[in-house]
């Protein structure tokens, strides 16, 4: 691989994203599809672009992503986390601004397991007094 390529692994819920960034024109490719084709929702696309817009590198880097597992929200969050890590590898001075925006911290929230005797993770069966 070329030395001008920067790598970051991002995770969110059950999704894992491998992000490769290199100097380019601003193309974002996710699983061999353009970002706009891969994510139907504008919200997901916005989440993916957030770290690039923060450091004003939207049209300076080409980003290639392979993402596995989870759904749309988890994958978008994982890609954002991976892009953030790749940006920090590119330039460590970006870390404070990315940290302040909350992109560096891995979102540790996961789906809570269903418990025995309950209908869902916390939802109890309906109580009948009589």
Swiss-Prot record:
GO MF annotation list: RNA binding; structural constituent of ribosome
Domain of life, per lineage: Bacteria
Keyword Ribosomal protein recorded: yes
Biological processes, Gene Ontology terms: translation
Entry keywords, A to Z: Ribonucleoprotein, Ribosomal protein
Gene Ontology CC annotation, any one: cytosolic small ribosomal subunit
SUPFAM superfamilies reported in the protein's UniProt record: Ribosomal protein S5 domain 2-like
Pfam families recorded: Ribosomal_S9
Sequence similarity: Belongs to the universal ribosomal protein uS9 family.
Protein name: Small ribosomal subunit protein uS9
Species for this entry: Shewanella halifaxensis (strain HAW-EB4)
Lineage: Bacteria, Pseudomonadati, Pseudomonadota, Gammaproteobacteria, Alteromonadales
